[in-house]
Amino acid sequence: MVTTLTPVICESAPAAAASYSHAMKVNNLIFLSGQIPVTPDNKLVEGSIADKAEQVIQNIKNVLEASNSSLDRVVKVNIFLADINHFAEFNSVYAKYFNTHKPARSCVAVAALPLGVDMEMEAIAAERD
C-alpha cells in the first residue's frame, strides 16, 4: 500500500499561528492540529468557557468538513485545559456534539497554551467513504 500524505488548509478556520497545516491526511485518516477559541477571522473569543468551547468545536467541525469528514467520524480527541476546574463546563458543551458517538478521549490540564487561551482541542478522524 502506498502511503499518501495530504495537507489540509481550511478557509473557514483561523489561520495557522505557526508553521503547520490545519490537518494532515494519511490515507483515510485525518490528524487535526489543535484548535483554540479563535474565530475564522482570527479574533480571540471572550466570555465563558462554554462560549470558547463552542468556537473550538466549530473550528474542529470546519476543518473536518474541509477534509471530507465530520464530527461523527472522529475516533480520538485530545483536550488541553489551562485550568482543570473548567472540566465540567467544557464537558457540558462537548456532550452536545458527542452524545451518541463517543470517540476515545483524553483531557489534561496544562500550565499554559498559545496566545494565553484557556483550552485547545485536537482530533483524529476517519475520512468519509
From Swiss-Prot:
Ribonucleoprotein as UniProt keyword: no
Q: Which InterPro entries match?
A: RidA, RidA_CS, RutC-like_sf, YjgF/YER057c/UK114
Compartment(s) where it occurs, according to its Swiss-Prot or TrEMBL record: Cytoplasm; Nucleus; Mitochondrion intermembrane space
Q: Which family does it belong to?
A: Belongs to the RutC family.
Q: Tell me the name of the encoding gene.
A: HMF1
- What would be one Pfam family of this protein? Ribonuc_L-PSP
Keyword annotations for this protein, in alphabetical order, are:
Cytoplasm, Isopeptide bond, Mitochondrion, Nucleus, Ubl conjugation
**What is the protein named?**
Protein HMF1
GO CC terms, sorted:
cytoplasm; cytosol; mitochondrial intermembrane space; mitochondrion; nucleus
Q: What else is known?
A: Present with 672 molecules/cell in log phase SD medium.
Q: Where is this cross-link: Glycyl lysine isopeptide (Lys-Gly) (interchain with G-Cter in ubiquitin)?
A: 52
CDD domains according to UniProt: YjgF_YER057c_UK114_family (cd00448)
Q: Which domain of life is it from?
A: Eukaryota
**Coiled-coil parts of chain:** none
Q: Which GO molecular function annotation, any one, does this entry have?
A: deaminase activity
